[in-house]
C-alpha cells in the first residue's frame, strides 16, 4: 500500500509541515519510529486509510492539521507513541474516529475540533 508521505527511521525531531495530501492508496501521512517528530500545518483528506498515523514515535507533536473524509481515522497514535501531544487539529467527516489513541500512554489532546466523524 502506498502512503502519501512515509517518514520512517529519520533523525529525532524531524518535521513534516505544510503539505497537502489527498487520495492516497493508504495513509495520508505515516510517521514511524521518529521520536520528537512534529507533524504540523498539513491538509490530509480523502485517503484510503488514516489522515495522519504515528507509530512508535515518543514525545511527538501533531498540531494545527486539517484532516477530513479519510476512510478510517482522522488522526491515530498507536504502538508506543507515548507522551505525545495532539493540539489544535480539525478532524471532520472521517469514517471512524476523528482521533484514535491506542497502545500509547501519557497523551495530551487539547484544543482539537471534531465534527461528523
Question: What residue spans do the PLM features occupy?
Answer:
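Short glycine/acidic-rich loop motifs that flank beta-strands on beta-rich extracellular proteins
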Residues: 1-9, 25-33, 48-56, 71-78, ...
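Short amphipathic alpha-helical surface micro-motifs
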Residues: 11-12, 21, 34-35, 43, ...
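All-beta strand scaffolds that present successive hydrophobic residues in beta-strands
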Residues: 13-17, 37-42, 60-63, 83-87, ...
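Ampipathic, surface-exposed secondary-structure segments
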Residues: 57, 61-92, 104
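Short hairpin/turn module used for nucleic-acid contact or packing/dimerization
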Residues: 80, 96, 100-117
